[in-house]
Each structure stands twice: as structure tokens, then as C-alpha cells.
Regions:
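Bacterial N-terminal signal peptides that target proteins for export
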Residues: 2-16
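Residue-level "hotspot" positions that anchor or transmit function at local structural transition points
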Residues: 14, 43, 126-127
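Bacterial N-terminal signal peptides
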Residues: 14-24
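Bacterial Sec-dependent N-terminal signal peptides
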Residues: 22-46, 183, 187-195, 201-204
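Composition-driven recognition of low-complexity segments enriched
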Residues: 27-29, 68, 82
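Electrostatic cytochrome c docking/interface patches
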Residues: 34-66
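Electron-transfer interface patches adjacent to heme c in soluble/periplasmic c-type cytochromes
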Residues: 70-75, 79-80, 84-204
Length: 204
């Protein structure tokens, strides 16, 4: 299995410094995401509908014993312009892609901000293995440092369940991230691009 999770830039000493300094020291500098490798992908539709909204939510975050409210996409966290959260960057203003519009071809979608969020998040995963994925482990502080502190108290958090489901249910081999196969397997009832809010996101 290809491991897509990125390592903490700067090695263990930089990671330790990040934890000590806190939320504004999760990383920094210009980030250039490496190209995706491997033949299996995660589902774009599920990401857009079920996972990306988590990054915009106001969440309770505990850092150095102090609990505050913030979003993952906030400046000082994982915002793509002012965030210091390492390679994982989120464009907070990314607009949903109309997957029912035939003009939105895969090539066009891959140039949009929502897709950039998708690739950035997928880069923090080990496809098919939520337990090994930094996108799950870091906000839970599961044997890994996270400059943003504890975001989710346990794996029972509904947000974690959605992220785990996304990672644990990759698109079938040989199909790309826009495969409509996932519309019926990852949503109830089946995802309808013309009425995206009519379906519920499946989760573990």
C-alpha cells in the first residue's frame, strides 16, 4: 500500500518546537504539495459533501490546557495563505463544485479550489487505513504531535467517523476520484448531484 501521509517538515526537533510554541507554530513557509502517486483514490463527491465542511466548523480545541473555539481553516492553523499548519492547507473560500453540470469536466475540476482542498486532505491519509492517517491521528493526538492541540476527544466524535469513512472507503481500483460508483455506496439515499443535500453521508 502506498503511504500518502506527509512527514512533519524539519524532523522531530521542529515538531517538538511546534508543540511548545503552540497553534501559530505548526509549520510555515511556502508549501508545494507533491503530485499524487499510486492507482487508488478517495472519493471527491464524499469529500466535498461530508469532509470539507468539517474544516469550516467552529470546533472546541484544547491546547496547553486551554480550550478555545476555532476552525481548521482559520489563519494560524491550516489556512492556505496565513496558516502555519504544515503541508495540510485549506482554502476556506473554496466553492462547491456543481457535479451535475457536464461542463465541469475532471480536468476543469482539478484546477478549482475545492479540488486543491481535496488533494491536500488526501495527502494526509494512508488510503484505506484511517488508523494510520495523519488526518485522523493528529487532531486526536494519537502518538503524534499536533501544534493545533486536541481537536476531537475520541474516535467516537461524528466528525472523526466521517473522515474515517472517507479514508476507509476508497474508489474501486481502476476508477478515478469522480467515480459515480461511490454515489450509491457512500450516501443514503444514493447521492444525486442535482440535489446534493438530499442524501446523508454514510459513516462508520
Amino acid at each position: 500500500m502506498t503511504k500518502n501521509a506527509r512527514q512533519f517538515p524539519g524532523g522531530p526537533f521542529a515538531a517538538a518546537s511546534c508543540a511548545i510554541i503552540g497553534l501559530t507554530a505548526c509549520g510555515g513557509g511556502t508549501v508545494s504539495d507533491p503530485p499524487l502517486t499510486g492507482t487508488q483514490h478517495l472519493a471527491f463527491a464524499y469529500f466535498q459533501q461530508c469532509v470539507n465542511p468539517i474544516f469550516q466548523k467552529q470546533l472546541q480545541i484544547t491546547l496547553n490546557g486551554v480550550t478555545t473555539t476555532n476552525t481548521c481553516a482559520a489563519g494560524g492553523c491550516h489556512d492556505n495563505t496565513s496558516g502555519t499548519g504544515g503541508a495540510f492547507r485549506i482554502i476556506g473560500a473554496a466553492q462547491p463544485v456543481d457535479l451535475a453540470n457536464p461542463a465541469n469536466t475532471p480536468d476543469l475540476i482539478r484546477a478549482l479550489d475545492m479540488y486543491k482542498n481535496f488533494i491536500s486532505a488526501q495527502g494526509e491519509t494512508v488510503i484505506g487505513s484511517p488508523a494510520q492517517s495523519l488526518l485522523v491521528r493528529k487532531p486526536l493526538l494519537q502518538n503524534v504531535l499536533h501544534g493545533g492541540g486536541l481537536v476531537f476527544a475520541s474516535n467516537l466524535d461524528p466528525n472523526v467517523k466521517l473522515i474515517e469513512y472517507w479514508i476507509g472507503n476508497p474508489v474501486p481500483q481502476g476508477q478515478d476520484e469522480f467515480s459515480t460508483t461511490t454515489y450509491s455506496t457512500m450516501f443514503t439515499p444514493a447521492f444525486n448531484p442535482s440535489s446534493p443535500n438530499s442524501s446523508t453521508c454514510n459513516s462508520f
